[in-house]
Amino acid sequence: MKKKIKAFLQRIINWIKKNKIKSAIAFLLLLIYYFSIPRTLFKEPYSTVIESKEGELLGAKIARDGQWRFPAQDSVPYKFKKCIVYFEDEYFYKHPGFNPGAMINAFKQNRKAGKVVRGGSTLTQQVIRLSRKGKNRTYFEKIIEIILATRLELGYSKNEILEMYAAHAPFGGNVVGLEMASWRYFGVQSNQLSWAESAVLAVLPNAPSLIYPGKNQIKLLSKRNRLLLKLHQEGIIDKQTYELSIEEPLPQKPYDLPQIAPHLLQRAAKNEEGTRVKTTIDYALQNRVNQIARYYYNQYKQNEVHNLAILVIDVQSRNVMSYVGNSPADADHQKDVDIIDAPRSTGSILKPLLYGAMLDDGELLPNTLIADIPTQISGYTPQNFNLTFDGAVPAHRALSRSLNIPAVLMLQDFSVNKFYEELQKFKLRNINKTPDHYGLSLILGGAESNLWDLCRTYANLSSTVNYYTKNKGQYRTNEFTELNYKNDFKPDFGSETNQKNILGAGAIWLTYNAMEEVNRPEGDEAWKFYDSSLKIAWKTGTSFGNRDAWAIGTNSRYVVGVWVGNATGEGRPTLTGVTSAAPILFDVFNLLPRQRWFDTPYNDLAEVEVCRLSGYLAKDNCPKIKQWVPKKGKSTKVCPYHKTIHLDKTEQFQVNSSCESIDNIVTKNWFVLPPVMAWYYKSQHIEYLPLPPFKEGCEGTQTTTMDFIYPKANSKIYLTKDFNSNVQPVILKVAYSERDKELFWYIDDVYKATTKTFHELPITPTTGTHFITVVDASGNEIRRKIEIVRE
């Protein structure tokens, strides 16, 4: 056998040597034949298609040439495969690309009819013809198709050729390909088609005009039923299936494509136009979140609030589970705008990041008292949402109640530049101006961000705690990674390290504990009394002018972000994070499986003694409690508010050794806040006791315990008029710790009034600069310089 093969090869070599020109021509022809099929047979643009992680269609965008042409599927459904082969090319699996018998029969019939009545082309030839669209149907073109068809058969399997045909065959109008046709005419995926539906689509490429609703129904029905009969006669379908199939009605009207995640489709089309993207979207969850969005849209539009967005993230993988980029509004209300990526004013949504950064840096402890008093800093006057003051609030309560004044004072202590650098590490893209541009308003909505970046930030923080507690106090170098919506993408979280990325696990955990204390939305106030209630860390935000309502929440497995407002930026009086965004947040969380709370990251915490009243590290004269704090918290300030005072035996008066014998002096530790803080604090805390007055004869030793509440130093005050054009008075206020004692008021060193108990004085001064002096009975005084301006 080997000798015969060797002899045969030798004869070929000898022939080539004798016939060099013929050999060269033959080689050239073979080369042309080999390269006659381009690597990419079809160059048509495709629709952008997105699918859920389960493979369900979420939406599609028309191709650039105006055709609905889906990218080819991995396989052709069995029913359609049988239908198309038995209808178009019964010998498909036997021929080399063309069928001589079918061609001869077609030639005879066409010649007899005097026109083309039968093509005789195989499915392989039809694939070639579809790829060479626009070519005239001549016998010369037919020869080219035959040659190319044989080459196609050599390079591709029969199943691959069927896939090409199914993806590019015309199905009427601008519908191209089986998958699009199954959605357009039957509203289902191609693998869900019945035998009757598959038969309809098998006959359509042969005569696409038959599909127009209400027209040619008899012809289409006849073609379909003949094919079904053939399938029955060939044993492909049984008698019962055949009889049931011929009773199925023909499609009467086209179906709309699913639009389950239209804004995610926009996002995918920007990055991967003309491809099929299998996403990480959970199909059932997406549909239910869409229902929630529709429900609240129908409610909110009655108050002229037309837009909202919802994003659900899996913390462990950073995968997007649900993506609702906007409400189902109409074109007049910017329904096509993807709010998830749109920069909007942050409101209070950045407060947890400041709180966490200060904990992590050892600048405060969870219970550290923060001032909540009238505040003016270089002309900037922050106000709490409820326009009240608490005097002093524990830092964690200031966060959970979203108080603005404590947040501004915290930022002032931490510094705008330092906090800005922290935010840059989180890669909040829209915070892109200088720190000086934002100033202290950075913490109250002076900056912009978007739902995508904020949800990513909280997902990364949550994952930091999870990994740290489950891996013996280790972090990962790439923990702060991007969110992902593509199912085939696997994030790289880097290698283990003992160095934190941005915030330590302890600071994050304590921040989440504070966020978990937030009061639930209206109608759900009793949530904390039920064991089965959701335990999540969440934060709301409302921008200036009620233009943006935010709510972002997280547990150990999921992050949910919600934005509500108008894409135009129009504000509405009732639009707030708590009343508008938070209800959506909790409805979405109710769709998700319950999760356990974050494990405590003990390796990143230290137990210390703190003052029970001030929240600072405890001094010897403080009432003490133990508390877990970040390790740097061991170096924070000690309590500045506890003082040791001396009282007489009745403990009603302060004394000293100059006016009381040492044997009669009682020493006590007393919690003393600065005058303005104390003035507001005592109205919220009936247990707060101001310092006892000095016993008569000891007054000279006391220090001043009064301060201005209003005005602030060097204030510029504008006098306003009422509706009757009368100038409104300015109300001066002073906090004074001595109960039932008098204060004497002077304007420009001229006595004006005496006040007792409530130290307020209305004045209507002239324009210009004035000096206000307040003196108590012991001669202690405070002064303020103000400038009066009339509007």
What are these regions (language model features)?
Residues 2-303, 315-321, 326, 373, ...:
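Juxtamembrane regions of bacterial inner-membrane/periplasmic proteins
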Residues 55, 83-85, 231, 289, ...:
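Active-site SXXK
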Residues 279-300, 312-314, 323, 330-342, ...:
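A penicillin-recognizing enzyme superfamily signal
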Residues 381-384, 415-456, 471-479:
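Mid-domain, small-residue-enriched loop/turn segments at the edges of structured enzyme/sensor domains
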Residues 68-73, 304-307, 331-353, 366-370, ...:
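Short active-site loop at a secondary-structure junction
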Residues 93-102, 176-179, 239-242, 335-336, ...:
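Short, well-structured active-site flanking segments
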Residues 112-137, 191, 254-269, 364-419, ...:
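Conserved catalytic neighborhood of penicillin-recognizing serine enzymes
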Residues 17-20, 490-496, 535-791:
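Soluble, non-transmembrane domains of envelope/secretory-pathway proteins that act on or interact
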